[in-house]
Swiss-Prot record:
Pfam families to which the protein is assigned, alphabetical: AsnRS_N, tRNA-synt_2, tRNA_anti-codon
Species for this entry: Debaryomyces hansenii (strain ATCC 36239 / CBS 767 / BCRC 21394 / JCM 1990 / NBRC 0083 / IGC 2968)
Protein name: Asparagine--tRNA ligase, cytoplasmic
Catalytic activity: tRNA(Asn) + L-asparagine + ATP = L-asparaginyl-tRNA(Asn) + AMP + diphosphate + H(+)
Recorded superkingdom: Eukaryota
Cysteines engaged in disulfide bonds, as pairs: none
Record has Transport as a keyword: no
Keywords, in A-Z order: Aminoacyl-tRNA synthetase, ATP-binding, Cytoplasm, Ligase, Nucleotide-binding, Protein biosynthesis
Top-level EC class as recorded in UniProt: ligase
Recorded name of the encoding gene: DED81
Length: 552
C-alpha cells in the first residue's frame, strides 16, 4: 500500500503536488481523493513525545477525510458533466453558426418595388410593400421567428422575420440600437394581437446599416432606467432615445408650434433680439458675465427691453429665445439656460394683459392636446391632465396673504405673512393646490418686483403685475404693465443703482412717443413639466444646463 503525507501548515491541495514527504498535501480529504487506497500520514505531535513528525491518521480523522474525499469526487464528476455540457453546447452553437453561414439573404427581384416611407405614415400604406429605415428599439429572437420593433423618430413598427431571415447569422448578431433598412409588406394585426399602430411589417429583405456594440459596450449597459440621474445626464445623447424623453421633446416641438400659431392669430410679429447684452433686467447677481472685446457684457436674462423697442416700429411682438440665469440653484424648477417665450403688447390696460394671458394659455394647451401626435403623448405621459378653462381666478397679493395666514401657512421665517413678504414657492404651491384652479395672482408690492413695473394708480405701494399659478405645478408665467412715464422710469433705474447711460436706448422709448404697454415671459420647460407631468424641468430641456452641468 502506498502512503501519502499531509501537512496542514506547509502542504497544498493541488494536482501539481505529489503527496510525498517533500511535497505533502494540505488536507487528508484531498489526499484520499487523489489516492483512494493510500495510507495517510499526517504531520502532528507524536504520541508520548513533545516532538512533531509524521504519524498515521486517527480513525475519526480518517472517517471525516473519507467523507470529504467523497464530496470532492462528486464535485469533480459534476464539474466534468458541466464541462461536457458546455463543450456540447459550444459544438452545437458552432454547428448552428456554420449552418447559418450557409444561409444568405437575397432580395427577391420579382417582388413589387418597395415604397420608401417614414413610420408616421404606416396607416396610409397598409397592404403596400415598403422600405423603412431606423434603429432597433426592441429585439426578440426565438426558434424560427424574429421580432424587431423599429424606430425612426417619427414612429414605431413591429417587424416580423421568418424562415431564413430569422435563421441567418446576421439576424442572430443584431443588437439594440443597430440601424437597419427593412423591406416588406405592412399588414393589419390579426385579432387578439397587439403592436404599435395595430400593424406589423412582414419582412422579405433587410440590410444592416450600422451594427451597435454588444457585451460591455451594449446600449442597455450604457443607459439603465434606474441609474443615477447624473449618469443618465452624462449619457443624455443616448437617453434621449428612450420613449419618455423623446415623447417630451415631441410635445415640446408641438408646444412651440402652438405658441407661434396663437401669436399669428393675435397679429403678433416674431423678432430675434440679441443674446449678448450690456444691460440687466432681473438683477445683477444672476448675470453671466463675459469679456466682449475688452468691454463687460452679459448673456441675456430676458429680451423684454428689446421687445419694448419694437412696439413703435412693428406693433405687438414676441420672441422665442434662450435666456440665461446664473442662479446657483439646485431646485427642480430652475435651469441656467432655458427657452424663454416673451411678448410685449402696446396700448393696452392691465385687464387686457390678464385676459390675453388667459387666452394664450387656454388656446395653446387646446392646440397641443388636439394635435394628432402630441395629444396621445400627453395622455400617455400625464393621463390625469385637465386643460384649463377660462376665466381664471383672480386673486390680489394682499388677499393671498390673508388666505395663507387663515390656513396657518407661515412665511420663510416661520411667522405670519405681512405686506412686503415674498411668497415662497412652497407656500404658493400649497395655496394653489388647495384652491385647485388656475390663479392670476396680481398686484405685488413694488419692493419685491422689478424696477420697470407700472405702479397701480389706486395704490402706489403695489404694481400692475401678475403671476399665473397652476395646480400641481405652481407658477408657469409672470408679467406686468411697464412703467411708461420717463421720469418715473429714470428714478427707478437710479434707485436700483444701475448705470442710466447704459439704458439710454430704453428710456428713449418714453421720450419719443410713450404709450401704456405690458408683457410677460413663459418658461418653455415649466409649461412642458406641467403638460407632461415631469418632476423636474431638466427632463424638458434637450441638453439641460444648471449648476455644475454643462456637458455633453
Amino acid at each position: 500500500m502506498s502512503q501519502v503525507y499531509v501537512n496542514e501548515k506547509t502542504g497544498a491541495d493541488s494536482t501539481d503536488v505529489s503527496g510525498s514527504e517533500q511535497q505533502p498535501f494540505q488536507t487528508p480529504a484531498f489526499a484520499l481523493f487523489k489516492n483512494e487506497d493510500a495510507k495517510i500520514l499526517v504531520y502532528k505531535q507524536l504520541e508520548d513525545s513533545e516532538e512533531f513528525g509524521y504519524g498515521e491518521i486517527s480513525a475519526s480523522a480518517l472517517k471525516k477525510a473519507k467523507k470529504g474525499a467523497e464530496g470532492l469526487k462528486k464535485k469533480q464528476e459534476k464539474q466534468a458533466k458541466l464541462q461536457e455540457e458546455q463543450r456540447k453546447h459550444q459544438d452545437d452553437a458552432a454547428k448552428k453558426f456554420a449552418e447559418m453561414d450557409l444561409i444568405s439573404i437575397k432580395e427577391d427581384e420579382s417582388l413589387p418595388q418597395a415604397k420608401k416611407i417614414k413610420l408616421r405614415t404606416v396607416q396610409d400604406n397598409i397592404g403596400t410593400r415598403v422600405v423603412v429605415q431606423g434603429w432597433i428599439h426592441r429585439l426578440r429572437l426565438q426558434k424560427g421567428l424574429g421580432f424587431i420593433t423599429l424606430r425612426d423618430g417619427t414612429g414605431f413598427i413591429q417587424c416580423i422575420l421568418t424562415g431564413d431571415l430569422a435563421k441567418c447569422k446576421t439576424t442572430h448578431e443584431l443588437t439594440l440600437e443597430s440601424t437597419v433598412t427593412i423591406k416588406g409588406v405592412i399588414n393589419k394585426l390579426p385579432e387578439g394581437k397587439s403592436a404599435p399602430g395595430g400593424v406589423e411589417l412582414k419582412v422579405d429583405y433587410y440590410e444592416v446599416v450600422g451594427l451597435a456594440p454588444s457585451g460591455e459596450e451594449a446600449f442597455s449597459n450604457k443607459v439603465q432606467e434606474n441609474a443615477d440621474p447624473s449618469l443618465l445626464l452624462d449619457q443624455r445623447h443616448l437617453a434621449l432615445r428612450g420613449e419618455s424623453l423623446s415623447a417630451v421633446m415631441k410635445v415640446r416641438s408641438t408646444l412651440l408650434q402652438a405658441i407661434r400659431r396663437f401669436f399669428a392669430e393675435e397679429g403678433l410679429l416674431e423678432v430675434t433680439p440679441p443674446c449678448m447684452v450690456q444691460t440687466q433686467v432681473e438683477g445683477g447677481s444672476t448675470l453671466f458675465k463675459m469679456d466682449y472685446y475688452g468691454e463687460e457684457a452679459y448673456l441675456t436674462q430676458s429680451s423684454q427691453l428689446y421687445l419694448e423697442t419694437c412696439l413703435p416700429a412693428l406693433g405687438d411682438v414676441f420672441c422665442v429665445q434662450e435666456s440665461f440665469r446664473a442662479e446657483k440653484s439646485h431646485t427642480r424648477r430652475h435651469l441656467s439656460e432655458y427657452t424663454h417665450i416673451e411678448s410685449e403688447l402696446g396700448f393696452i390696460e392691465f385687464d387686457d394683459l390678464l385676459t390675453h394671458l388667459e387666452r394664450l394659455i387656454t388656446y395653446v394647451v387646446k392646440y397641443v392636446v388636439e394635435d394628432p401626435v402630441a395629444g396621445p403623448l400627453i395622455k400617455q405621459l400625464n393621463p390625469n391632465f385637465v386643460p384649463p378653462q377660462m376665466p381664471f381666478k383672480r386673486m390680489e397679493y394682499i388677499h393671498a396673504l390673508d388666505w395663507l395666514n387663515e390656513h396657518g401657512i407661515p412665511n420663510e421665517d416661520g411667522e405670519k405673512f405681512k405686506f412686503g413678504d415674498d411668497i415662497a414657492e412652497a407656500a404658493e404651491r400649497k395655496m394653489t393646490d388647495t384652491i385647485g384652479v388656475p390663479i392670476l395672482l396680481i398686484r405685488f408690492p413694488v419692493e419685491i418686483k422689478s424696477f420697470y413695473m407700472q405702479k397701480c394708480a389706486d395704490d402706489p405701494r403695489v404694481t400692475e403685475s401678475v403671476d399665473v399659478l397652476m395646480p400641481t405645478v405652481g407658477e408657469i408665467t409672470g408679467g406686468s404693465m411697464r412703467t411708461y412715464d420717463n421720469d418715473e422710469l429714470v428714478a427707478a433705474i437710479k434707485r436700483e443703482g444701475l448705470d442710466l447711460d447704459s439704458y439710454y436706448w430704453f428710456t428713449d422709448q418714453r421720450k419719443y412717443g410713450t404709450c401704456p404697454h405690458g408683457g410677460y415671459g413663459l418658461g418653455t420647460e415649466r409649461i412642458l413639466a406641467w403638460l407632461c407631468d415631469r418632476f423636474t424641468v431638466r427632463d424638458c430641456s434637450l441638453y439641460p444646463r444648471f449648476t455644475g452641468r454643462c456637458k455633453p
